[in-house]
């Protein structure tokens, strides 16, 4: 049995999740500060932000696990936190950290989780083969969870979140700690869920993940929304030009040389980021410097702007703990 649903209707016009004026304080610290956004049915919506921006706290309030200090929340037609239990029956959750039971087998983890939703044993048994196939764990059904690789455990966690056939998936950094192959497999599975009509709300630190999966993004910092839009719109609006990354032994001299040829130059560590609408003069200058060995150790990379450029422009390049 495959985990299949009728083809999804695409992205709807009615929000399945709405957040308005959400606030949360811990003592003197405001963690979420007047946050508002909505997610439409069938959409993949991404929450982006540096560490401590308020992403996980926002998810906890959406699920009724943390009480907001102000604001309104609606999830699957239910008011949160008043009817959080009813809403959660229609939601699947993929937490940031693994919370599978290592003493049980793959199948037992699915069975036990299904009971939390009050599902009949027959319903759980009917859904399990499709979920195991979805996670590519058919051959591991009777294996203990502790024997699985990190990628297998993460796929099982995603499959487990589907046991109640949810309308919405809430995913907190779903591919953290995975190697590239495992990450791409998770992305493939998430795209199939979106195609079937599921709605996904995710947080992630992987900008490529957000750019590949998300229909819309909300960037938050210090608990506030600082930008929202489709990935390509954010790239065009916030960056709007090509990027040339420059590495060399003498960054001050390189900056002096290149600044007149770029709209903007930013330094981060041992790298200069040069933003240019017409990058050819800049690239030609770098090529000349490389060919004549005028600047030892000089290397450069010319590329289109991407979502990571947007993220760093909006939130800064300083390290966050």
Curated annotation (Swiss-Prot):
Protein location: Cell inner membrane
Organism: Ralstonia nicotianae (strain ATCC BAA-1114 / GMI1000) (Ralstonia solanacearum)
Quaternary structure and partners: The complex is composed of two ATP-binding proteins (NodI) and two transmembrane proteins (NodJ).
Topology with respect to the bilayer: Peripheral membrane protein
GN (gene name): nodI
InterPro entries: AAA+_ATPase (IPR003593), ABC_transporter-like_ATP-bd (IPR003439), ABC_transporter-like_CS (IPR017871), ABC_transporter_ATP-binding (IPR050763), ABC_transptNodI (IPR005978), P-loop_NTPase (IPR027417)
Stretches assigned to the ABC transporter domain: 17-247
Molecular-function annotations in GO: ATP binding; ATP hydrolysis activity; transmembrane transporter activity
Disulfide bonds: none
Functional summary from the UniProt entry: Part of the ABC transporter complex NodIJ involved in the export of the nodulation factors (Nod factors), the bacterial signal molecules that induce symbiosis and subsequent nodulation induction. Nod factors are LCO (lipo-chitin oligosaccharide), a modified beta-1,4-linked N-acetylglucosamine oligosaccharide. This subunit is responsible for energy coupling to the transport system.
Pfam families, alphabetized: ABC_tran
Enzyme Commission code(s) on record: 7.6.2.-
Family per record: Belongs to the ABC transporter superfamily. Lipooligosaccharide exporter (TC 3.A.1.102) family.
Keyword Lipid metabolism listed: no
Positions with a binding annotation for ATP: 49-56
Keyword annotations: ATP-binding, Cell inner membrane, Cell membrane, Membrane, Nodulation, Nucleotide-binding, Translocase, Transport
Keyword Transmembrane: no
PANTHER family, A to Z: ABC TRANSPORTER ATP-BINDING PROTEIN (PTHR42711), ABC TRANSPORTER ATP-BINDING PROTEIN NATA (PTHR42711:SF5)
A Gene Ontology cellular-component term: plasma membrane
Gene3D superfamilies per record: P-loop containing nucleotide triphosphate hydrolases (3.40.50.300)
Name of the protein: Nod factor export ATP-binding protein I
């Amino acid at each position: 049995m495959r985990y299949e649903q009728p083809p999804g209707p695409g992205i709807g016009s009615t929000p399945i999740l709405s957040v308005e004026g959400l606030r949360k304080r811990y003592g003197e610290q405001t963690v979420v500060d007047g946050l508002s956004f909505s997610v439409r049915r069938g959409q993949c919506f991404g929450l982006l932000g540096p560490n401590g921006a308020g992403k996980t706290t926002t998810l906890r309030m959406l699920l009724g696990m943390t009480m907001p200090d102000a604001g309104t929340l609606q999830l699957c037609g239910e008011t949160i936190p008043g009817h959080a239990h009813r809403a959660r029956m229609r939601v699947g959750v993929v937490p940031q950290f693994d919370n599978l039971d290592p003493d049980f087998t793959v199948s037992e983890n699915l069975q036990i989780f299904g009971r939390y939703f009050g599902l009949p044993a027959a319903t759980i048994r009917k859904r399990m083969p499709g979920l195991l196939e979805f996670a590519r764990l058919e051959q591991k059904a009777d294996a203990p969870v502790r024997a699985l690789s990190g990628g297998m455990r993460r796929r099982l966690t995603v499959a487990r979140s589907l046991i109640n056939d949810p309308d919405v998936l809430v995913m907190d950094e779903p591919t953290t700690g995975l190697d590239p192959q495992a990450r791409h497999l998770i992305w493939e599975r998430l795209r199939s869920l979106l195609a079937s009509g599921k709605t996904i709300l995710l947080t992630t630190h992987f900008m490529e993940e957000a750019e590949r999966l998300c229909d819309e993004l909300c960037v938050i910092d210090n608990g506030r929304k600082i930008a929202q839009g489709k990935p390509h719109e954010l790239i065009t609006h916030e960056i709007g030009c090509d990027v040339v990354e420059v590495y060399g032994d003498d960054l001050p001299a390189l900056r002096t040389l290149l600044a007149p040829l770029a709209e903007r130059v930013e330094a981060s560590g041992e790298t200069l980021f040069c933003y240019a609408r017409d990058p050819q003069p800049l690239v030609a200058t770098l090529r000349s410097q490389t060919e004549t060995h005028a600047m030892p150790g000089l290397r450069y990379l010319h590329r289109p702007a991407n979502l990571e450029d947007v993220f760093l422009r909006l939130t800064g390049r300083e390290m966050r703990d």
